[in-house]
């Protein structure tokens, strides 16, 4: 999988920009707030239709404009592919694959796979459970685009059920028949999410443990555990569904009192344990970076294994923050097999071999141009 070109129109701080990628590694260098991360965000949007930096499309469209656009040309084993994402400040999107409109997100997702590693990913360790759930969901969307539909379905049921519980708080009367219907829908959609998250971590956890040992010199033992809100006993859908309903019964009074749903995968946790200690309580920022790097390498390898092609790797202002050992581990892993886009404010911390084989682009005020150091092939 190779991203050949990217065209940005009225996206973030870009007016009109076309970037042709000429090497397996591209380094985007520039001061802060010039547009480096915006370019990686555009790739992320094409990959998952989600942004880890914004939940509102009006923030993605250049100020003063109504519409923005991202177009990518990709080379896959199956042949070339054009992807177009049209953004509107009112939140309505249109999607195209090879210039043909697609109505369902499902038909757009899965064409471009990318793994992003940014300084914000330290929140995987020290942040809330929601950060770790969001990470799981993004991986699943790439491995199984249908998961995006299941997640949307679940969140819709969750919002409706919460609105129903809040109406009980206001009005003081409860329609038990309607509540039972919402319980069944929440349990049904929630079961489908829970099973997929469980299966993902069964495959991802050993890879993360392997990479963590390799990077830390086998001095630390990482364990990654799925802690679902509804405890799992096996993978049988009916058993999980019944366990879901039972827990809803147990929490019924508390939910009615609080006016919100207390049961379901929206309250799952992913436990990260180093040497039998929760990682958020463990060690330095460097050790936390090691953990996140191990998770990202595991994600990279699993996506490659499942889709049969190496995904893109997006490194947003993190490579220069890694010490030489971690840099070398990352270099050794990706080599030239994974196309890599890297942002940085300076080139001083980079390995000479990286610079020698990389395309170097400068970014200033939403404009990208070739550096004097650029490989001009």
UniProtKB/Swiss-Prot annotation:
Which InterPro entries does this chain map to? DNA-binding_RecF, DNA-binding_RecF_CS, P-loop_NTPase, RecF/RecN/SMC_N, RecF_2
Which keywords does this chain's UniProt record carry? ATP-binding, Cytoplasm, DNA damage, DNA repair, DNA replication, DNA-binding, Nucleotide-binding, SOS response
* GO MF term list: ATP binding; single-stranded DNA binding
Q: Which Gene Ontology CC terms are recorded? A: cytoplasm
The record's annotation in Pfam families points to: SMC_N (PF02463)
Query: What gene does the UniProt entry assign to this protein?
Result: recF
Q: What is this protein called?
A: DNA replication and repair protein RecF
This protein's species is Cyanothece sp. (strain PCC 7425 / ATCC 29141)
Top-level taxonomy = Bacteria, Bacillati, Cyanobacteriota, Cyanophyceae, Gomontiellales
Instruction: Give the family this protein belongs to, as stated in its UniProt record.
Output: Belongs to the RecF family.
């Amino acid at each position: 999988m190779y991203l050949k070109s990217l065209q940005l129109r009225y996206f973030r701080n870009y007016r009109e920009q076309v970037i042709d990628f000429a090497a397996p590694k591209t380094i985007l260098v520039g001061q802060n707030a010039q547009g480096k991360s915006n370019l990686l965000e555009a790739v992320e949007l094409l990959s998952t239709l989600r942004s880890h930096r914004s939940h509102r499309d009006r923030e993605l469209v250049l100020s003063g404009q109504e519409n923005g656009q991202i177009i990518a040309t990709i080379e896959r084993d199956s042949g070339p592919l054009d992807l177009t994402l049209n953004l509107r400040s009112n939140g309505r999107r249109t999607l195209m694959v090879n210039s043909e409109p697609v109505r369902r997100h499902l038909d757009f997702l899965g064409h471009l796979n990318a793994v992003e590693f940014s300084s914000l990913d330290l929140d995987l360790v020290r942040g809330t459970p929601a950060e770790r759930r969001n990470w799981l969901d993004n991986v699943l969307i790439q491995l199984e685009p249908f998961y995006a539909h299941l997640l949307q379905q679940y969140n819709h049921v969750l919002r409706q059920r919460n609105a129903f519980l809040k109406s009980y708080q206001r009005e003081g009367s409860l329609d038990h028949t309607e509540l039972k219907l919402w319980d069944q829908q929440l349990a049904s959609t929630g079961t489908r999410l829970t099973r997929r998250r469980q299966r993902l971590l069964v495959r991802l956890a050993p890879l993360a443990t392997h990479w963590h040992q390799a990077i830390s010199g086998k001095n630390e033992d990482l364990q990654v555990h799925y802690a679902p809100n509804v405890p799992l006993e096996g993978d049988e859908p009916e058993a999980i569904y019944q366990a879901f309903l039972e827990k809803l019964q147990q929490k019924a009074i508390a939910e009615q009192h609080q006016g919100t749903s207390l049961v379901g995968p929206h309250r799952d946790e992913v436990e990260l344990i180093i040497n039998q200690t929760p990682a958020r309580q463990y060690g330095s920022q460097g050790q936390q970076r090691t953990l996140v790097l191990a998770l990202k390498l595991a994600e990279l390898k699993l996506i490659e294994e499942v889709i049969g092609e190496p995904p893109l790797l997006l490194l947003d202002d993190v490579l220069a923050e890694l010490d030489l050992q971690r840099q070398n581990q990352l270099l050794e892993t990706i080599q030239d097999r994974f196309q890599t886009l890297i942002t940085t404010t300076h080139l001083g911390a980079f390995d000479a071999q990286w610079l020698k084989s990389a395309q170097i682009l400068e970014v200033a005020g939403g404009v990208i141009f070739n550096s004097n150091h650029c490989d001009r092939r």
